[in-house]
Swiss-Prot record:
Similarity comment text for this entry: Belongs to the RING-type zinc finger family. ATL subfamily.
Protein name: RING-H2 finger protein ATL29
Renumbered residue ranges of the record's region Disordered: 179-237
Record organism: Arabidopsis thaliana
EC number(s) given by UniProt: 2.3.2.27
Amino acid sequence: MSTIIPSPLAPQPPQQHYVTPPLTVILTVILLVFFFIGFFTLYFCKCFLDTMVQAWRLHHGGDTVSDNPLQQPEAPPVNPGLELRIINSFPTFPYSSVKDLREEKYGLECAICLLEFDGDHVLRLLTTCYHVFHQECIDLWFESHRTCPVCRRDLDPPPPPENTKPTVDEMIIDVIQETSDDEEDDHHRQQTTTQIDTWPSSGQTSSIKKEQNLPEKFSRSHSTGHSIVRNKPEEEDKYTLRLPEHVKIKVTRGHSQTESCVTFAELIRNRGYDHRRFGEVSGQTQSKN
């Protein structure tokens, strides 16, 4: 009896197991997608609305006014310096053109930088007080100041009164007053010369000596922050340019290699100010002539 050997069974193919993702992961992805879609939708809508509102305001021609009533428009900054046309009214010239014409022979220096003037330096003369400075120094000073650095004289005159023009009688009175002032000055100089020529008595001599022994000192705030003590006339005048009258008139009228075409006195007169208070000597010189 024969035995039947069963044939081996064929191997079954491996079964593929599909694992479904958990529900939480699916919900997270869906929420992120909706979040980004909503965010970008709102962002683009806002940009579109802002563009439309701005275009509408520009189309209707008007500056955008703030909806906040408490927000006031900012006032324009006030310029603390001097006007450019007033600065240009002061003449500029090289120091070499007036160096040999000065009445004094001691050196001049700029009160701002404290440097002595050289021949190639360009100077600017303040015709109100005849203090002279380097053009760069004084122009930089006038950007934030309206006064002379030495004597502190205000170079920005007050606004003229409205609808007031000097009459002919007032002009005649001004001319007569200037002439009388000149005569009084000449008379005062003559009296002073007579008193100097007269020899004082012993009591007067002692009093004069006491007065001469008193030092003439005074402090003043300097432009660089320190104080100056003046004792000698040379120290008092080292910032002042003293010239002969014909040279002074030529410089103040802007004919000696200057950039300005209008003098300070003409500028003040055109604007309706009383230029006699600013120490301009050109009008007095013409009245003497």
